[in-house]
C-alpha cells in the first residue's frame, strides 16, 4: 500500500469526524448550551486555548474529535446545560453532526462536478434485434429508465446497483417504469436468451443504456443533489441486503477496510488528477454514510439519542413522566460496548483480508 494513500485515508476520516463534531458544536452554541471542550483529534493535547466557557484543543492524533457539552452525560442544574434544553434544541444538537456530514458530502460532489462537461443518463441506447418488446407498447430507444422494482433511478450507475441489490426470481423479472415524452410507462421485463456474434449464448434483458445531458450550473446542482440522495439510498440498500441475507459479516468494512479501499482506488487511477477526484468522490460517499449511520436509532449513536428524546416527549405528554436519565445512560453505554465489540471484530476481519 502507498503510504500517501494511507495518510490520505486517515486525514479523510479525521476531517469527516471533526466536521461531524463541528455540527454538534455550532448547534450547541446556537442553542446557548455550554461547550466545555471542543477538540480536533484525539489523545494528548498539543495546543489548547480557553476562550470564554470553552476549551479549544488540538490533539495529537488526527482521527476525529469531540464536543463535550455541559449536562451531556449527567444531570446539571445549569441553565446552559444540555439536559435543561427544550425538545427542538436537543433535536437540532443531536442531528447537527449528521447534517454537517450530509453537507460535506454535497459540497465535495458539487466541487467535483464544477469541471464536468456532461452527465451520463439512464436512457435506452440500443435494443437487441431479438428483443421481444420493441415498439410503442414496449420499450423504445430514447426511453429513460425512471425506476426498477420501485427503486428510483437517479443516476446512470443506479441501474446496475439496483439490479444487484434487489432480490430477483429465477427469470430475473423486473417491473420497470420508463419516461417517454414526459409520460410514465410501466413495463415488465424478464431475462431472455440471446446469441452473440460468435454464436455464444447468454442471458440478458436485451437493452443497453446510456445518454448524455449537457452540463451547466443547474444540471451540476441537480446531479449534485441526486448524487447525495443516491448515497443515502446506497447505504439503505446495503443495510437492506444485510437484513435479507444477500450480504453478511464478511461484506462489512471498518476503518482498516476503508483505508484499503481508498488505497486501491488511488493506486488503480490512471493519473494523479484521477486519483484525487476518485478519492474525493469516495470521501463524499463516506461522509454521507457517516451521517446516515449516526442517525440510525441505535444506542450510543445520535439516532439513539433522538429516539429516546422522541419517546420521552411522548411519555411526558401521555403519562406525565419520562424514562429515568440513568437508565438511558446505561442503554447508551451498553450500546457503545456492543458497537466497539463489533468494530473490533470487523477490524480483525479487515486485517485478515489484507494478509490472505
Protein language model regions, located:
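Residue-level signature of transmembrane alpha-helical entry/exit and packing/kink sites
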Residues: 1, 5, 9, 85-94, ...
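PDZ-domain C-terminal substructure recognizer with occasional recognition of PDZ-binding tails
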Residues: 162-201
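Internal alpha-helical transmembrane segments
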Residues: 30, 54-57, 61-129, 332-335
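Functional transmembrane alpha-helices
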Residues: 81, 85, 126-130, 193-290, ...
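Residue-level "contact hotspot" at macromolecular interaction interfaces
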Residues: 132, 138-139, 152, 165-167, ...
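Conserved PDZ fold ligand-binding element
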Residues: 135-157, 228
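Small-residue-rich helix-interface/hinge motifs
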Residues: 4-78, 293-314
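Alpha-helical transmembrane segments of multi-pass membrane proteins
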Residues: 13-17, 68, 101, 105, ...
